[in-house]
């Protein structure tokens, strides 16, 4: 078995619906990439949390272009392993759906051998807004939740403290 890591700084990211791609690092986060780019001030400083919160009402797309090595193309299977996809993630390879992640606590693996192309391949991951999802689910199934947190956080399999806590900001 050979392991090819797609981690690193070769990723690009953009807000869905916008054309401008930005440099991104994986593993990482939308917040870290937007801070590094200068688009977002430090959300842990003063009232900057509100600006960060507004940004995360949008969806974001991450993209990585990579070359499929000959050993990959000749392999019986090529598993794409995603660890820690932070929740509502649509994964595609060369425009073909590979899978969907709706739980940040589960590692995902898929055989992508049939989708690999000789030469350049494009891996794309679209992250839907966890804020919109939580609020939408809360409207359908309201229930008690912490007043310090975003309503509906209990309906999404994501670290609940990211939705706000008495000791921390609301930065899902």
Identify the function of each model-found stretch.
Residues 2-17, 29-38, 52, 57-172:
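Accessory beta-strand-rich segments of carbohydrate-active enzymes
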């Amino acid at each position: 078995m050979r392991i090819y890591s797609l981690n690193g700084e070769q990723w690009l990211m953009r807000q869905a619906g916008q054309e401008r791609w930005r440099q991104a690092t994986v593993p990482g986060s939308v917040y870290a990439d937007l801070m590094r780019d200068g688009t977002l001030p430090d959300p842990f400083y003063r009232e900057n949390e509100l600006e960060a919160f507004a940004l995360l009402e949008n969806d974001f797309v991450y993209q990585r272009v990579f070359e499929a090595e000959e050993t990959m193309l000749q392999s019986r299977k090529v598993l794409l392993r995603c660890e820690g996809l932070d929740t509502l993630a649509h994964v595609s390879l060369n425009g073909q759906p590979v899978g969907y992640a709706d739980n940040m606590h589960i590692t995902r693996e898929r055989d992508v051998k049939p989708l690999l192309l000789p030469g350049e391949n494009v891996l794309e991951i679209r992250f839907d807004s966890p804020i919109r999802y939580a609020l939408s689910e809360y409207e359908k199934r309201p229930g008690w939740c912490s007043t310090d947190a975003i309503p509906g956080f209990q309906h999404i399999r994501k670290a609940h403290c990211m939705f706000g806590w008495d000791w921390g900001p609301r930065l899902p």
